[in-house]
Every structure is written in C-alpha cells, then in structure tokens.
Amino acid sequence: MAASCVALLVLALLLLVLLLGLWKRGRQTGRARHMVVVVLGDVGRSPRMQYHALSLAQSGFSVTLLGFYNSKPRDELLQNDRIRIVKLTDLRGLGAGPRILQYGVKVVFQAVYLLWKMMRMDPAAYIFLQNPPGLPAIAVCWFVGCICGSKLVIDWHNYGYSIMGLVHGPRHPIVLLAKWYEKFFGRLSHLNLCVTNAMREDLAENWCVRAVTLYDKPASFFKETPLDLQHELFMKLSHTYSPFQSCSDPSHPDTERSAFTERDCQSGVVRRLHGRPALLVSSTSWTEDEDFSILLRALEKFEQQALTGDSLPSLVCVITGKGPLREHYRHLISQKHLQHVRFCTPWLEAEDYPLLLGSADLGVCLHMSSSGLDLPMKVVDMFGCHLPVCAVNFKCLHELVRHGENGLVFKDAEELAAQLQMLFSKFPDPAGKLSQFRKKLQESGQQRWDESWQHTVLPLLAHSQMTPRPHPPCGHPSCRGF
C-alpha cells in the first residue's frame, strides 16, 4: 500500500512537471537571450562557472546562476544587473543509516530539488553545467532541456567517478555506477567543453563525446599587485594572521610595517623591507588529489639547509582554501616547529586572492589529477600574476607547465626541496632564476579568459542554433558500456 502511494505521488509529480514544461516550452519570448549556468557546488569556489556567467552577461545575455552559496562570489558577479543568482540548499546532517543509503537519499533529494528549482525559472536557450559534480545534475539538466526546449552544454572539468575512486577505490560498485551514469548521460548533451586536449581526445575515443577545448585562462584581475596594494593587503592580513606581522617595531612612529613592507605615513611611500622573508603561496581544495605532505617534507629539508648557513631567506608559506582534509593538514603543520618557515592557512575573500598571488614570490601546486586529464586552475591564475610556479608532475601537465621555460616540475619532496633551495638562493637576487622565470612570464603575453571565451564559446552558441544534434551515432565498442 505504501509503495503504491509513493508510486502515485511520483507519477503525479512527473505529470505536473510535464504540464509545466509544455506551458513553458510555448513561452518563446526572451528564451534566445536567457542562459542558465548550473554548478551543484559552491558558487564562490567555482571560478570557471562564474567566468562563464560574466562572459555570457557581457555578450548581452541574461543569466541565471544556480549553485550553493557557501562562499561569496566576486563583486563583478554580484553587481551585474544581467546576472541573477538562485541559491541552492545542500542536504546536511544525514548521520543515520549506512553511508550508501545516505548517499542515495542525498542524490534523490538533490534531483527533485534541482528539478523543482529549474522548472520554476524562465525558459533558457542553453543550460551550462559544470561536471563534476554531475550526479544527479547531468540527468536533471538534460530532462529540463527536453521539456523546456533548452540545449545542454557540459563543461568537463574532470570525471566525477575518478574523484570518487580516490575515496572508495576504482572497482567499488558506487564508482562503477557513477562511471556508467556519467558516460550515458554525458553523451546526451548538445555541446561539450573541456579543459585539456588530453580530455578532449579521451572523451572522443572512450565516451564518443565530441568536445571543444576551452583552456582555463586568467581573468583580467589576475595581475601583479602594485607595492602600495601589497602593503595594504599585508597590513589587513596581519590583524588576523601572525606571519604577516612585523617581527620588529619601526624606527619611526610615523612608519607602518608588515612582515614584508613598510610605509611612511607622511609621504605614503612604500618599500620592501631589507632581509624580508620570501612569500610562498599554494591554494587547495584540501582533497585526496593533493598531497601536502610533499610540501611539508620539502620545507623541512629547506629548513635544514637554512640552518647550515646557506644564503637562504626565511619563508612565509600561505596555503589558502577550504576542504575536507584542511584540519588534518593543519594538525600536521602544528606539529612542525621550524625556525625559518612560518605557516598560514587562511580562507581569503574573493577580491584578496588575486592580490595575494600578485604579491607572492613563488607558487607551489600539488594538484595531481584523479583522471590525469585536467589541469590546475591555480597555476593559470599564478601565471596571470606573473608568479613563477613549481608544480607536481602528472600526465598532461605539459599542456600548461613547461619545465625550465615557464616553471619547474617535480615528482617528490626531494626534487621540490632542491628547487626551493635553487630558486631562493641569495634571495632577492634580480639576476637569479626566480627573477628570470618572472621576466619570461611578463614577456609571454598570455591570452586572458574574455578573449579566449569570445573566440571559442560564442561562435559555438551561434552555430549550435542551426545544429540540432552534434553527436552522430557511434559504433565504437567503448561507447556500448564500460
């Protein structure tokens, strides 16, 4: 009896959705100029989808952006009259029952909730969806598109099942189910974007999905930070984080000092302190695909070299970001008692993060792709700020970092430690390797996001209006299952 009631309720809900969809499908007015951007994650920590929304708005479209609102997005997004943010609610506190049951309940809740939210919106020409996370968003967005006449655009950042595999193992039933789901529904999209050529080739060969590579590019606000703004940022952070505080009082009462800079309050002139520490920056989502023990071991080796009297500076190591393993690594950091290295693990405001990168001396990236097919956006942002980078190696990193040309690549803590010692030797040396890398980045004239998006995505939208189906039938064996 209970099962029959549930079935009738589901059928009634589907009928209601279908009737609403048919009514909305008839409302053609404004659809061609309306776009929906969906991220089943924190909008504030999804910069690429924020960039999509901004680029669409700058191209004259009205945009509805759906996502969780755990972190504040950029002001440019919030202040844009063409962009409306619809906040999604995450289901939390499912502490009872087996984990697989909790996961199933969460997926069902998200599917129904996302469907309800999207059906209440005005019809859109395109639905832009970030994947991962794509469960259950790909199926829901495809279903809404079928009912309302919208075309689905999937932006493949990685494979969701490969991230799940880091936690559960690659042969876990949930992981295999997620892979099947991702492959099946991923083929139903009208357009596909991806972040590397390696992923584009993998999608074509193994999934029969045709995608266009849209590399991550730095937004215009990622640039070198002027010295006066560096000082303001350091003073702001010094109120909360002791590594930014000056170790000594200024000699004059009209002087304002941070750990790196000082400002004459009368003249307003800012200068870098002689003997200042070097500022090393890394950003992370604190997940299993980034092993920060590599950096910690490398810094311990750096400390040993500094204690022997080598011409190495002290370091302030700033690791920004939020994520599930943050407290684990903060505990490990608290057990390190280093004389020449100080740690700081802040979560920065969206506007302060580019300023920090533009003020730093070196960036370190520990991202190791779960699929081996995506690239770390943090390195893109660092390059936009002309910040030299040391990055841990994986399969397609060469599409972004070219060892010895625009950065350095390492495989373990020993190699990273050697690179840190080489780069910071006689710091700050204008003729040193660190300065040479920065100069190369300054001269590279790299493309920015707006230019890349206008050149790559906008023509696809215009062409797709005349192309009903981009995926022809495929007979490749890999497209018939796992």
From Swiss-Prot:
The modification Phosphoserine is found at S242. GO terms for biological process: dolichol-linked oligosaccharide biosynthetic process; protein N-linked glycosylation. SUPFAM superfamilies: UDP-Glycosyltransferase/glycogen phosphorylase (SSF53756). Its EC number is 2.4.1.142. Gene3D superfamilies: Glycogen Phosphorylase B. Pathway: Protein modification; protein glycosylation. Residues 24-99, 121-482 are cytoplasmic. It is found in: Endoplasmic reticulum membrane. InterPro entries: ALG1-like (IPR026051). Its main location: endoplasmic reticulum. One of its GO terms (cellular component) is cytoplasmic side of endoplasmic reticulum membrane. GO terms for molecular function: chitobiosyldiphosphodolichol beta-mannosyltransferase activity. It is an enzyme of class 2 (transferase). The chain crosses the membrane at residues 3-23. This is Chitobiosyldiphosphodolichol beta-mannosyltransferase. The lineage of its organism: Eukaryota, Metazoa, Chordata, Craniata, Vertebrata.
